[in-house]
Amino acid sequence: MTNVFIYPNVEFIAGVDEVGRGPLVGAVVTAAVILDPHNPIEGLKDSKKLSEKKRLLLAEEIKQKALAWSLGRAEPAEIDKLNILHATMLAMQRAVENLKIQPHFVLVDGNRIPQLPMSAQAVIKGDSLVAEISAASILAKVARDQEMIELDRRYPEYAFAQHKGYPTKLHLERLAQFGVLPEYRRSFAPVKKLLSTLLSKNHEYVFKIQK
């Protein structure tokens, strides 16, 4: 951590972060973590700056050493109904609610905070400044990546393990070739455009049934 973050003077502080706002498919996943100040974890940083191997190792260490940790999520149908921002806030609320210890204060990565029953603060670049947020970003990233690997096993033709659901050139090509799965976010532009094109051409289009 290059800069020094001034922590609030309370006992239990939770860090919260999200992964998966940008992908076209799957849930947005959040995590909340309360670290043990007497059992520090070395090497915590923004999950995007860590190798996959290091993330997996740190995720296990976080789960073992943290006083409490939990995951929250908002499904594609909720994202389509609420929009991605509000769905992310909902997933963050769920992560905090799922903690076995209720925090006295919550630090959230970014510039917005969800509605919570305790005090909270948004921290821009918090995943690089606050250990609790870094830990949350790692847990959320590992959890969502594992979900994409599982989706890849079910639908290998989409190459989800490679692009993790983000709108890469490969992903857009496979989406156009194989169609929209139930796990896709239909409100996201590339998916919405494909569905609209198919409907406008009067194609009979049925969502693929899960294998």
Curated annotation (Swiss-Prot):
A GO molecular-function descriptor: RNA-DNA hybrid ribonuclease activity
Binding note for cofactor: Manganese or magnesium. Binds 1 divalent metal ion per monomer in the absence of substrate. May bind a second metal ion after substrate binding.
This protein's UniProt keywords: Cytoplasm, Endonuclease, Hydrolase, Manganese, Metal-binding, Nuclease
Domain RNase H type-2: 11-200
Keyword set includes Zinc-finger: no
EC number: 3.1.26.4
Keyword Iron: no
InterPro entries named among the record's database cross-references: RNase_HII, RNase_HII/HIII, RNase_HII/HIII_dom, RNaseH-like_sf, RNaseH_sf
Cofactor: Mn(2+); Mg(2+)
One GO cellular component term: cytoplasm
GO biological-process terms attached to the record: DNA replication, removal of RNA primer; mismatch repair
Binding site for a divalent metal cation: 17-18, 109
Job of this protein: Endonuclease that specifically degrades the RNA of RNA-DNA hybrids.
Family: Belongs to the RNase HII family.
Protein's name in the database: Ribonuclease HII
Biological source species: Histophilus somni (strain 2336)
Top-level taxonomy: Bacteria, Pseudomonadati, Pseudomonadota, Gammaproteobacteria, Pasteurellales
Gene: rnhB
